[in-house]
């Protein structure tokens, strides 16, 4: 005894063949933010590297004394970390562009983007913190330790370059937080409710 009710069969077929929600597609914003991260990394590196300054210091006799980023390990780490960030942002921008027309690949890339973006955020934050600490010592000095005097009143150009570079790196870390948030939200929007 077969049922002649076709209405029940069509309801079952339509509900089972409904595709999973596609989620909101933010890959255009992802590509833009990754390009902005590259630009911020590049600008921060160029600004700190070009901030060299030489001043004549009056010790027993006048001596030219240069200030360069490579004389401070914290600034060298800062340049290296932001260079890695720039390279990473180029690679992930290209990956985002490549995956922009492939929905299955987009979904697979999102967890990896979150993981690697979080790692890069840690690198940017640690580099910015170490460079910021040394820059603060250059600006204010430390009267409790002999030899840690202020230098920014003498090396004003160098200190301005360091400060601007740190500010741009902080902006880059905010962009990285936005990238993590965007990827997490994209994954969340793809989960069926």
Curated annotation (Swiss-Prot):
Transmembrane segments: 31-51, 74-94, 109-129, 162-182
Keyword Manganese annotated: no
InterPro entries: CASP/CASPL, CASP_dom, CASPL
Similarity annotation: Belongs to the Casparian strip membrane proteins (CASP) family.
Superkingdom of origin: Eukaryota
Name of protein: CASP-like protein 1D1
Keywords carried by this UniProt record: Cell membrane, Glycoprotein, Membrane, Transmembrane, Transmembrane helix
Extracellular face of the membrane: 52-73, 130-161
Subunit description: Homodimer and heterodimers.
Sites carrying sugar chains: 52
Primary location: membrane
Membrane topology listed for this record: Multi-pass membrane protein
GO CC annotations on file: plasma membrane
Localization terms from the record: Cell membrane
């Amino acid at each position: 005894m077969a049922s002649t009710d076709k209405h029940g069969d069509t309801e079952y077929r339509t509900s089972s063949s409904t595709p999973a929600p596609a989620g909101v597609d933010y890959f255009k914003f992802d590509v833009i933010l990754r390009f902005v991260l590259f630009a911020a990394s590049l600008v921060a590196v160029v600004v700190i590297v070009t901030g060299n300054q030489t001043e004549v210091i009056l010790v027993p006799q006048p001596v030219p004394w240069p200030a360069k980023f490579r004389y401070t390990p914290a600034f060298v780490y800062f340049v290296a970390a932001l260079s890695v960030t720039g390279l990473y942002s180029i690679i992930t921008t290209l990956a985002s562009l490549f995956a922009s027309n492939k929905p299955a690949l987009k979904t697979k890339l999102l967890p990896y983007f979150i993981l690697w973006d979080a790692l890069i955020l840690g690198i940017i934050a640690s580099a910015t913190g170490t460079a910021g600490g040394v820059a603060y010592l250059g600006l204010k000095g430390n009267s409790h330790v002999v030899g840690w005097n202020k230098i920014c009143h003498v090396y004003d150009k160098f200190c301005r370059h360091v400060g601007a570079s740190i500010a741009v790196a902080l902006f880059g870390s905010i962009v990285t937080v936005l990238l993590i948030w965007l990827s997490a939200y994209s994954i969340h929007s793809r989960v069926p409710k």
